[in-house]
């Protein structure tokens, strides 16, 4: 025989080493796998593995040639019963493919049964025979083998072979021809049933949420005691952590002042730890936590925090952390996060100003010119003067304003209203604009070129030149804008100048309503 078929029909790659093994293999009387085409290999019965895997023959094989990795891989597949499970999957797939039919009722694939078809002829049927189906049904689904599902390379090859051969020789085979020879490829029936029973038990425990059975807990407790007795002198020399004793919540926790013996404290910690684990595992049944969904998880978390009123607790924790950070100091005594270095904001400066309105000031750059659009209706508008201080009503949108003036010398103006209003913003050097290069004419008359900004909804008043003081002008009652505010317009002093611009100063005002934008440019008459 040129080649030796072994390991479930696979052809080995080492002919010389396996040819001597073929003489010792006792072949059955009836040929299990007839010589047929490749279609017959779908559901064929595997041969029993050869007995040439003993340690002596393996040593001879290693001495003659280097070990063949493929042959060792086949040995591993056979010894750990991986081939049986693979064949089961293939046979199930074959049955499903054989049961499929086309729309015309013709079987989709013609499958030949290798057991019932003789060697000379070929007979195709759409479904396997009853014996084949019965053989497939009794095939177990649990595969046993070495730990980690891989054969150890140290010293258990001969032991594994002897145990496997003992199981094969002592087991009852599923087929009549294999039963006559007393050979098989499965472990004993008792062991198989025991393994399946243990597997079902483990699955039930997983469904119920209990990770420890009675036998496992006893075994783990014994293992815990054994490890604790061996390593108690190593990790109990130091005192237990305070948070660990609080986590256990045991009243039997020994305080740090008293130094107990390592042997006394160890069983207490172990018992409390086991109690905590058991209580947590028993609570898993009543929790009934929903599955994690990344789309709904933020909403669920927020709802959970709101339902259990955890937001105040979290806020208190954050406040405590902020207070601690504020009170933290460096080694030299300075605060870690100083708050006095921050510059005073405009809102703090504006608190010293008289409350003229509700909205904060919005100063504009005096260097940028404002676009003006001439309107013929403005000269015809008549303004009525109001004596005394302005009394703003709640309906009017009164605004707070700032005067930004860059004089070269302190002027003498008899009007107290303008002097009092410009004195407070100028007291702060930060609010003053940087000095601008002035012409000789502006140096002679420093109060010309006054730029006044009213940060109401879009009101800008500019006085090009001229000496005077401010006066409050209210718009007429028939104004088309219901939310109009008071206009602060300059009133010229009796002191006149020879320039034509002083006789007719330009005043630019703009009013922006909710849906409209109007900018007006007009002229004021000179009061002599």
UniProtKB/Swiss-Prot annotation:
Instruction: Cite the record's Low complexity compositional bias ranges.
Output: 497-510
Q: Does the keyword Cytoplasm apply?
A: yes
Q: Positions of the region Disordered? A: 43-68, 335-444, 497-528
- Cellular component terms (Gene Ontology): centrosome; cytoplasm
Q: Tell me which UniProt keywords the record has, alphabetically.
A: Coiled coil, Cytoplasm, Cytoskeleton, Phosphoprotein
Q: Where is the composition biased (Polar residues)?
A: 51-60, 363-378, 434-443
Q: Where is the composition biased (Basic and acidic residues)?
A: 419-429
Q: Specify whether Coiled coil is a keyword of the entry.
A: yes
Compartments annotated for it: namely: Cytoplasm, Cytoskeleton, Microtubule organizing center, Centrosome
What does the record list as coiled-coil region(s)?
A: 81-104
The record's annotation in InterPro entries points to: DUF4702
Q: Name positions with the PTM Phosphoserine.
A: 389
The protein, known as: Coiled-coil domain-containing protein 116
- Where does this protein come from, organism-wise? Macaca fascicularis
Q: What is the lineage of its organism?
A: Eukaryota, Metazoa, Chordata, Craniata, Vertebrata
Q: Give the encoding gene's name.
A: CCDC116
């Amino acid at each position: 025989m040129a080649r030796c078929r072994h390991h479930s029909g696979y052809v080995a790659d080492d002919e010389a080493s396996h040819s001597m093994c073929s003489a010792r293999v006792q072949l059955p009387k009836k040929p299990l796998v007839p010589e047929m085409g490749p279609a017959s290999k779908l559901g064929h019965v595997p041969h029993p593995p050869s007995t040439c895997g003993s340690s002596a023959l393996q040593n001879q094989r290693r001495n003659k040639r280097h070990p063949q990795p493929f042959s060792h891989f086949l040995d591993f597949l056979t010894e750990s019963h991986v081939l049986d499970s693979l064949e089961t999957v293939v046979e199930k797939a074959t049955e499903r493919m054989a049961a499929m039919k086309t729309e015309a009722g013709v079987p989709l694939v013609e499958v030949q049964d290798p057991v019932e078809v003789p060697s000379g002829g070929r007979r195709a049927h759409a479904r396997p025979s009853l014996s084949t189906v019965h053989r497939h049904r009794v095939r177990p689904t649990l595969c046993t083998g070495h730990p980690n599902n891989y054969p150890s390379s140290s010293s258990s090859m001969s032991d594994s072979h002897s145990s496997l051969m003992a199981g094969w020789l002592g087991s009852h085979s599923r087929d009549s021809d294999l039963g006559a020879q007393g050979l098989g490829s499965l472990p004993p029936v008792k062991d198989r049933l025991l393994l399946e029973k243990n597997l079902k038990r483990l699955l039930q425990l997983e469904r119920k949420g209990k990770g420890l059975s009675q036998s496992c807990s006893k075994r783990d407790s014994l293992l815990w005691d054994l490890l604790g007795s061996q390593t108690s002198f190593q990790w109990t020399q130091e005192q237990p952590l305070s948070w660990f004793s609080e986590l256990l919540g045991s009243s039997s926790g020994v305080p740090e002042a008293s130094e107990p013996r390592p042997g006394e404290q160890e069983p207490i910690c172990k018992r409390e730890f086991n109690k905590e684990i058991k209580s947590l595992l028993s609570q898993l049944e009543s929790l009934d936590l929903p599955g994690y969904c990344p789309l709904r998880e933020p909403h669920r978390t927020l709802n959970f925090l709101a339902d259990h009123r955890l937001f105040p607790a979290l806020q208190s924790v954050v406040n405590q952390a902020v207070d601690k950070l504020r009170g933290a100091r460096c080694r030299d005594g300075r605060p870690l996060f100083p708050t006095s270095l921050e510059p005073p904001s405009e809102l703090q400066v504006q608190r010293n100003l008289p409350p003229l309105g509700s909205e904060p000031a919005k100063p504009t750059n005096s260097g940028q010119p404002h676009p003006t659009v001439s309107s013929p209706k403005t000269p015809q508008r008549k303004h009525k003067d109001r004596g005394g201080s302005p009394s703003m009503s709640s309906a009017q949108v009164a605004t707070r304003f700032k005067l930004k003036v860059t004089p070269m010398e302190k002027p003498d103006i008899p009007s107290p209203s303008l002097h009092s209003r410009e004195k407070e913003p100028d007291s702060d050097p930060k609010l003053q604009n940087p000095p601008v290069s002035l012409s000789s004419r502006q140096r002679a008359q420093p109060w010309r070129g006054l730029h006044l900004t009213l940060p109401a909804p879009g009101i800008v008043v500019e006085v090009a030149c001229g000496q005077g003081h401010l006066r409050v002008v209210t718009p007429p009652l028939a104004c088309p804008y219901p939310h109009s505010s008071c206009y602060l317009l300059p009133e010229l002093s009796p002191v006149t100048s020879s320039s034509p611009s002083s006789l007719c100063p330009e005043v630019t005002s703009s009013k922006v309503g909710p849906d409209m934008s109007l900018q007006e440019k007009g002229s004021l008459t000179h009061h002599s």
